[in-house]
């Protein structure tokens, strides 16, 4: 069977052991996150070759190969708090879980409706400062920011505020556990990306035009913790790259005495069709080990 490859992978990372990711505990084999919005995915292998050289011209006589490395790189169009946690080893705080509240930063332009007071969209946090700056008719700052005093509910008191004046407000507010929900990602200096069991399903098309299920399995991959977040107002939207190094380990459902860096499974069942193959993960055909 010969085939061509022109399809992206859907990737799942599963817990290798009972482990915590982003503040949540996953048992061995439990899926941590599915990646279904990838733009590219690449498996790259490399080896180091050294040679015995000699004779006239010092030509190569014998070669030795070793230091085999395998890397799986995927580029995701979308990002989630959990994927950030996987990439960086960060902890997640969910305002809906437990009693811990998240303090959020907000800015708002407000026109004075009541003498000496401003009405905000959110209730200012009791322990946080509120700063206001008066704006002119063109929306420019007219002076330095001054501290306001918290009032009742969403109201703050601003000395000298006249009806019709406009202020720019910088303040903080808390999640309330009901309507206002938030997630917080904490990237710590001593936490890094972990090890996972990777399965990447895709389609290989044979010479008859039939798409056959194929799967890359890396039984032990370590997520590199390097990352770049690019923000721009023009051009293509940012993508997010995950690079994982493969380490030898046995397959979860295979010969436990044989360690591999990667296993590639290709289904060559002649009775399958395109629709069935696109959703199947059965591998009745050859398995290629690296």
Regions found by a protein language model. Give the residues of each.
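Short, hydrophobic/aromatic-enriched beta-strand segments in well-ordered soluble domains
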Residues: 76, 165-175
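Low-complexity, intrinsically disordered segments exposed to solvent
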Residues: 59, 156, 179-180
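Solvent-exposed edge beta-strands and adjacent loop segments
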Residues: 1-87, 140-148, 214-241
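Extracellular interaction modules
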Residues: 66-71, 159-168
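Hydrophobic beta-strand residues in large extracellular and virion-surface proteins
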Residues: 11, 130-132, 146-148, 155-158, ...
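Short, structured patches in soluble enzyme cores that scaffold and shape functional sites
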Residues: 76-78, 200-202, 246
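Mixed-charge, glycine-accented linear interaction segment located at domain edges/termini
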Residues: 152, 157-163, 214-290
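Extended beta-strand solenoid/passenger and fiber regions
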Residues: 81-148, 173-197, 202-212
């Amino acid at each position: 069977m010969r085939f061509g490859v022109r399809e992206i992978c859907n990737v799942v990372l599963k817990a290798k052991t009972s482990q915590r990711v982003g503040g949540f505990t996953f048992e061995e084999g439990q899926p941590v996150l599915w990646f279904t919005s990838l733009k590219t995915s690449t498996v790259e292998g490399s080896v180091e070759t050294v040679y015995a050289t000699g004779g006239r011209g010092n030509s190569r006589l014998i070669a030795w190969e070793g230091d085999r490395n395998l890397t799986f790189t995927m580029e995701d169009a979308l990002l989630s708090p959990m994927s950030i946690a996987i990439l960086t080893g960060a902890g997640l705080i969910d305002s809906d879980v437990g009693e811990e509240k998240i303090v959020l930063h907000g800015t708002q332009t407000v026109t004075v409706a009541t003498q000496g007071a401003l009405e905000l969209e959110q209730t200012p946090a009791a322990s946080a400062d509120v700063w206001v700056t008066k704006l002119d008719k063109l929306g420019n700052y007219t002076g330095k920011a001054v501290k306001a005093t918290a009032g009742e509910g969403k109201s703050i008191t601003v000395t000298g505020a006249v009806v019709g004046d406009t202020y720019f407000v910088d303040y903080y507010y808390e999640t309330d556990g009901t309507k206002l929900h938030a997630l917080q990602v904490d990237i710590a200096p001593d936490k890094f990306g972990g090890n996972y069991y990777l399965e990447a399903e895709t389609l290989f098309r044979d010479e008859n035009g039939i798409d056959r299920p194929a799967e890359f399995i890396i039984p032990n991959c370590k997520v590199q913790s390097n990352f770049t977040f690019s923000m721009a107002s023009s051009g293509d939207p940012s993508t997010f790259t995950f690079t994982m190094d493969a380490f030898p380990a046995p397959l979860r459902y295979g010969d436990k005495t044989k360690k591999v860096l990667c296993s590639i499974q290709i289904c060559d069942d002649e009775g399958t069709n395109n629709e069935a193959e696109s959703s199947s993960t059965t591998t009745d055909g050859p398995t290629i080990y690296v």
